[in-house]
Each structure stands twice: as structure tokens, then as C-alpha cells.
Amino acid sequence: MLLHPWYHISCMKKYADALPLYRQEKGFELPGVSINRTTMANWIITCSQNYLKPIYDYFHRELLKRHFLMADETPIQVLKEPVRRPQNKSYIWLMRSGEERLPPIILYHYTETRAGGNAADFLDGIDEGSYVMVDGYSGYNRLKKIRRCCYAHIRRYLMEAIPSGQEKDYSHPAVQGVLYCNKLFEYERSYKAKGLSYAQVYKRLQKDAKPVVEGFMRWLDGQHPEKGSRMDRAVTYIQNRKDTLMTYLEDGRCSLSNNASENSLRPVTLGRKNWLFSDSQDGANASMIVYTMVEMAKAHGLHPYNYLKYLLDSRPGTNTTDAELKDLAPWSEKARIECNKKSE
């Protein structure tokens, strides 16, 4: 297949710059280039299926080898899904590696529904004892590995329960709960600032953070808020995740929040405001693949355009071995050299 030279530019504009195809179509008309949005959409789908899917699948296999993962999800509208109305919500899942000082892996995945089984299926194969940082969505309960709640979400619920003007009223239960969370985040920041090893962090967690978490649990047991109040909502949220609160202390590589996942979803949510929907399932799947390549490039300090061009010049296929795909990963020395050449 001969790739059109505008393909890389079209991908960059849509997935890195959040410029939808209909606006690109109008922009191309100015210099006298005639490329319609249907043609561009077909380029993206065909190239994603033929050349980018093998490296996407390689990233997926590598992600499942990690022991610290993070997950989040956000809605997407796909107009043409079998036996579904165009108005039905579909979902984009973000699955990424945790903050464990290994090359980051960021994957986007489309499904028709938000059913928890979708997350479990995508992460099927992770090792027993792996950690998956998730938010409060109950669908993640389908994961058969260790789950951890996000203390940032817990803190957010407690902050919402504090009446306006009472943020420093330390007699208010919600303020007290926030202080426990603040102390844990303070410790985490200090460990990172000192550059402690994971073994050192684990020891400090037992000494510093464990008493705080235990105190938070005792505080939680003593809360009996008015039914239907914001404090009741916060306490219920935390109680439902009580069994995962202590897992933060089990390994120095664990983190307190799922903020890295939320940050990784931001480019997709920004793009969605502009392109609004995917027309077809093939289009949605292709978008997830290209978003993965763009965000993987950015996470490794490579220009997305150069990385996409490097991948498509390499033309990986179904017969490409993992050893060969490794050279196409953005953390490989070969990929970095080739992408930097394209910047010169």
C-alpha cells in the first residue's frame, strides 16, 4: 500500500492537535489541496489496521508483564454500532503502567459498553499479585487481581462534603478526613523529593504512613453522618473501598492516586470536544490505536509526527517478531535515533 504523504500530517492534526477531519478538509483547500474527510478517515483506519496494530498489540503484551497498572475510562459516541442507537454511550478505556521507573506504556481501548468485564478482559493475563490503580467505578470489581482505591478520589469526596467557609473548621468530620489524606500525600511527596529507593519507601511507609492509614480507618468507623448528606456520600464511598485502603502500604512502588491515568485521558477528552464522535467501530478502534502511538511518543520525549512516520516507514505486520517490534518501541535506542534524525 502506498501511503499518502499527508497521512502523517492528518493523524498529527487530529490526535495530537485535536483538529477534527472536517476542519482539516477545509484547511487543505486553502493551499489548493483536495482531500476530503472520508479519504482521510479511510487512511487512518487502513494504516492503523495494517501497520500500527502489530505494535499496539506488542505494547499490550508488554503492559501485561508489569506489576503496577492504572486504569480509567471516559464516554465516546460511536454512531454505527450493531443493534445500538447512535445516542448510546460507548467507552474509551485508558490502561497504563504505574509509576515504577520503567518505560511508560499507555494504551487506549474502545468498547461498546462500560461493563466491568471489558476491563477484566483487556487485563486478562496480568500476573497474580499485580496492582491495578482504579477509581471508584464498581465495574473494576471484576478484576481478579489486587485492586487499590485512589486516595485522590477519597479526598475529593471529603472536600465536597465540607460546607463553604468551614475549610479550616477542624471539628468538622470532613475536614478531619481531608487532613489524614493530606498527611499521606505529604509523605509521598517527601519520599519522591528525597529520591528514595522503593525498598526505602516501603520501610518509611511502615513507619510514617501506616499509623496515618490506621488512624483514618478508626476515624472512618466512627462516622455516622446524616443520611443523604454529602458527608454520607463521602463515607459510603470510602466504606465501599475499605478493603483496598491498606494495600497502598504493601509495596514502595504503589502510589496514592490515579492522577496519572486522568492526565493520560486528557488528550482524548480534549479531542472529543472537537471531533464529537466516531462514525464507525473501525474508526473508533483506529482512533484508539493512533492515540496510543501519539501519547507513547510524547511520554518518551519523541515528536509524534516523527514517531508515526518511523512506524509507517518500518511497516510492521502480523509476521513481525517481538524482537523486531522492540526496536519500534519509543524507548528503544533505534527508535530514538531514527526519530531524532527526522527532526534534524
Model region roles, listed by residue range:
Residues 1-344:
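Catalytic center-proximal scaffold of phosphoryl-transfer enzymes
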